[in-house]
Structure formats: C-alpha cells, structure tokens
Design a protein with these regions (language model features):
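Inter-helical loop and helix-membrane interface segments of multi-pass membrane transporters/permeases
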Residues: 10-13, 42-46, 81-94, 98, ...
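C-terminal membrane-solvent junction of multi-pass transporters and transport-like membrane proteins
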Residues: 358-370, 396-460, 464-479, 508-514
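Membrane-interface "cap" regions at the ends of multi-pass membrane proteins
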Residues: 1-37, 66-71, 75-87, 94, ...
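Transmembrane helix-boundary motif of multi-pass solute transporters/channels
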Residues: 18-58, 211, 247-252, 264-266, ...
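Hydrophobic alpha-helical segments and their helix-loop junctions in multi-pass secondary transporters
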Residues: 66, 110-136, 193-217, 289, ...
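Hydrophobic, membrane-embedded alpha-helices of multi-pass small-molecule transporters
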Residues: 17, 24-34, 106, 111, ...
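Membrane-embedded translocation segments of transport machinery
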Residues: 2-16, 20, 182, 186-340, ...
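Membrane-water interface regions at transmembrane-helix termini and the short interhelical loops
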Residues: 42-46, 72, 76, 87-90, ...
Length: 514
C-alpha cells in the first residue's frame, strides 16, 4: 500500500467556522430526548432534590473529566475514533470502530423516536388520541404486538415520517461539518431553547404546578446512603453528556488548532445540566397539574419516564389543560428538535469515520452510511414490533455497549502513550482553565472503576433475569445480538486497509506523543 499520494487527491479536513458553532453543536448533541423524558423521572425516584447532590458530584468528577478526555484525543490527533486511537496505537483502531458502530446502532432506533414525535406534533392539533392516550399510542398508532412476539408488518403511520426524518438528517450531514451540522445547530438549538422555555413558563402557571415542583425538589436525604442512587446519577451524566463513545471526540477533531477546549467543555457540561433541571421543572409542573386535576398526589401518578411519559402521560395532560393543542405542539416540537441535534452528532461520527478511512466526500459517506441505516431502521423500528425492539436494543447498546466502550476508552488512554499526562499537557497548552494533575487520577482510576461496576452490574442482571418481560429469543437476537454485531463489524473494518492518502501512516510524531 502506497504511503504517498498525488497532491490533487489531498483534501483539507473540514473545521468549525467558529468556537461558537462548535459549542452549539456540542450542547445540541448533549441535549437529547433523555434530558426531557429520563432525567426528571430519575431524579424524582432517587431522592428528589437530594439527587442533585450525587448528580453534581458525577458531573464535576466524572462527566466533565471524561468530556475533557474526548476533547483532548480528538483535538490532538485530528480524527474520528478509528484514526485518533490508531494514531496512539495500531491496536486502538478496533476500539475506534466499536465507538462508530455503537453510534450506528443508536441512530437506527433514535430516528424512530424522532418520527413518533413529529407525528405527535400533528396529532396535538386536534388531540387525536382522544380519551385514552395509552391505547392510542400502543395500539392505534404503533400497533404494538405482545412482548413474546415479533412482527415484520410495517406501520405506515411510523414508516412514512421515519423515512422523512432520514432524508432530512442525511441531507444535512451530506453538506459536511461547517455547512451542514454547524449551520443546522445554529438554527435548531436556539429554537429548541425558545420553544422549551415557552413550554416551561406555561406549565408554571397551571393549577397544581407548585405541588409538582414540591414533589420534584423536596429532598429525601436518606436516599444518599443508597449506592443505587449514586450509580443512577453517574449513569445519567454519562448518557446525557454523550460521552464515552466518540461523539465529542469527533466534534473536537474539527476544531482549529488554537481553540479553548477546556473552557468549552465546562460550558457544554453545565448547559446540558441546566437544561435537564429546566426540563424537570417543566415536566413536574405539568405533572402537578395532572395530579391536581385528578385529585391525587403526584406520588400516585404512573408513567413518569421514558416514552410512556412523553407519548401517554403528556397527551393526557394536554387534553386536560386549556390551550392544550398549543402546549402539545410546543412539547413535541421540542422533542423533535432535541432528537435531531443529537442524531446529527451520532451521524457525524459514522460519516466522519468513513471519510477518514476511505477518503470519501461527505455526500458519498452519507449515502454509504445512510442507505443501510435507513433500511434497518424501517425494517426493525417501523413495524408493529418497533417499540419492543427499540426498548431491547436501547437497553443493551447503552448499558453494555456504551458503558463497555467508555471503560475501554478510559483504560486505553491511560495506558497508551502519550497517556493522560500528555493529553493534559496538550489541553493546557491551548486552553483555559488549566486541568490539574488530579484529572489523571480521576480518568485513569476512579471513572474506569465506576464504569466497570456499572457494566458488571448490567451484565449480571441481564444474564440472570433477561430483560423485562421479553421472550428470551428476542433479548438474545436484538439485545446481545446488537452488541455482537457492533463488535464483529468493528473487527472487519479494522482489517480493511486504509485508502485515505493522508491516513496511511500509523507512526505518530514525537510531538504527538509528548
């Protein structure tokens, strides 16, 4: 394989046009569906206001440090995970591709949730779910089969908007980083914040809102003695910040060489957490109204997290409140925007990796990635089994795939040159504030220990009890199978020779290893 190439074949790697553009994209990636439908319920069931203590500890001592790690690797080695880790050690390329395929699996089902949300924007106008939002969501809309069944029968109400979502996001990514992802985030993220602020303000003035806020913020200090609460806090931070599987590493690789990396990470981290708390205020103000209207306590309400919160509980609230259709349009539009900004970041990891390895232009990489992803997405998540399959894949790809990837990433960067001290020196040479030496201890020992505990706990629970009430064959095929496919695909891509003229050498310079 030649290590040289004609100058004409060389292409300049895309970069963010400004630090602000990068920051908006990073925040847009972090702010996703989980901020709105996961955090409020997790906080409420794990100590209420007291949950903010382990949550902030996790943010400061795990979330921000691992965010700095990804920024350091991406910015220093100027590539997506396969190339960046390969530059550190040839054996690291497999880990890089595992990050890429984790992202690939996630986008296939994440797009389906965005499609649901887009449909519900329209349904909100006339409250199409009627008096029984649960039956409408599970039966009329999704046509969901039993937990022990699987069906290939397509659901047009899902497939059509799902196809449109794919066309939209692939079109954006095909324009590259600066002209596509950056410009889209400059529009979508501010719009998301404006819509969600309007939603929260409306919710705060509903009867019973104060009862909901009291339920959300009243601390149960005894919960702090429960290790499960602390693990939930760390899990929420890892998943909501989009760290541990290459997204932020990829985004940082498009920064200019002179960029304030550490300061941007702090802003992105705290912006994400601020939005989560804002989401908690909005969600529980609305839940307080629901409890007030039904004459029950907030603690008696069901469906306080996940898709059920968004597509069953909130439609009930919308039907109860004055001006409900407008509230519904605001809520589901917020879900669409949050989902799209996160989808773009996941897609860029895959597209960027293909561009790095095969010297593809963004539009070609989008097609090579997008066509199979769209077909898989429609075949698995646009059917009557879509909800069940999504639930299984999401559980395993996050709790096993993402966490396992994060464990491997922290250990790899701690053991392979330039090691953590070298990465810290790199960040401090271009950024402020400076990272203290304790960062090496947190990223090299504390964070891998916490992540390993989370991974082992998930593995033991899954091996002993399966997952929820789903049939064993479904859990095996779609749960363990999704992780296995990511591993196999990673091994195959690692063995494929590099064809990018500027990516043929694995030998890092002395300066890179310093």
């Amino acid at each position: 394989m030649s290590t040289a190439a004609p100058t004409a074949k060389r292409r300049t790697r895309d970069t963010w046009t400004s630090q602000t553009g990068f920051l908006l994209a990073a925040i847009g990636s972090a702010i996703g569906l989980g901020n709105i439908w996961r955090f409020p319920g997790v906080a409420y069931t794990n100590g209420g206001g007291a949950f903010l203590v382990p949550y902030l500890v996790a943010l400061l001592f795990a979330g921000i440090p691992i965010l700095w790690l990804e920024y350091a690797v991406g910015h220093k080695f100027r590539g997506t995970p396969p190339w960046a880790f390969r530059r550190m050690s040839a054996k690291g390329e497999f880990l890089g591709w595992f990050c890429v395929f984790i992202c690939f699996v996630i986008i296939t089902y994440y797009a389906a949730v965005v499609a649901w949300s887009s449909s519900y924007v329209v349904y909100s106008i006339n409250e199409a779910w009627g008096n029984d939002s649960k039956t409408f969501f599970l039966s009329s809309f999704l046509g969901t089969v039993g937990s022990d069944e699987f069906s290939w029968t397509p659901v047009l109400a899902v497939s059509v908007p799902l196809l449109l979502v794919w066309v939209c996001i692939l079109l954006i990514v095909s324009f590259g980083v600066s002209k596509g992802v950056e410009k889209a985030n400059k529009v979508f993220l501010p719009l998301l914040v404006v819509l969600f602020l309007a939603l929260v303000v409306r919710a705060l003035f509903l009867p019973g809102a104060l009862e909901g806020l009291n339920a959300f913020f009243t601390p149960n200090w005894s919960a702090l003695t429960d290790s499960k609460v602390w693990i939930e806090a760390f899990a929420q931070i890892f998943f909501s910040l989009s760290v541990g599987f290459g997204i932020m590493l990829t985004y940082a690789s498009y920064l200019k060489k002179k960029s304030n990396v550490t300061g941007t990470a702090l802003v992105a981290g705290f912006a994400n957490s601020s939005f989560e708390i804002l989401a908690g205020i909005g969600v529980f103000s609305a839940l307080g109204f629901m409890a007030h209207t039904q004459g029950v306590a907030v603690s008696e309400l069901q469906g306080l997290r996940g898709p059920i919160l968004s597509f069953v509980t909130f439609p009930k609230i919308i039907s109860m409140m004055p001006g409900g259709p407008l509230f519904g349009v605001l809520f589901f539009s917020s879900l669409v925007l949050a989902g799209i900004t996160s989808l773009l970041s996941l897609l860029q990891v895959v597209s960027g990796a293909l561009q790095d390895k095969f010297a593809m232009q963004p539009i070609k990489a989008s097609l090579v990635m997008g066509i199979p992803a769209t077909l898989i997405s429609l075949a698995l998540f646009g059917t009557r089994s879509g909800l069940n399959t999504l639930d299984i894949v999401d559980n395993f790809i996050n709790n096993v795939g993402v966490v396992g990837c994060a464990v491997a990433m922290t250990l790899f960067t701690a053991l392979v040159r330039p090691r953590l001290a070298g990465l810290r020196r790199h960040l401090n040479s271009v950024s402020a504030p400076a990272i203290p030496p304790v960062w090496d201890f947190l990223v090299g020992i504390v964070i891998p220990a916490v992540l390993t505990f989370m991974l082992i706990s998930s593995l033991i629970k899954s091996l002993r009890n399966g997952y929820d009430e789903y049939a064993t064959y479904l859990v095996t095929i779609f749960g363990w199978g999704s992780v296995a496919i990511a591993l196999i695909a990673s091994a195959i891509l690692t063995l494929v020779p590099w064809s990018h003229p500027q990516r043929t050498s694995t030998t890092p310079t002395d300066q890179e290893m310093a």
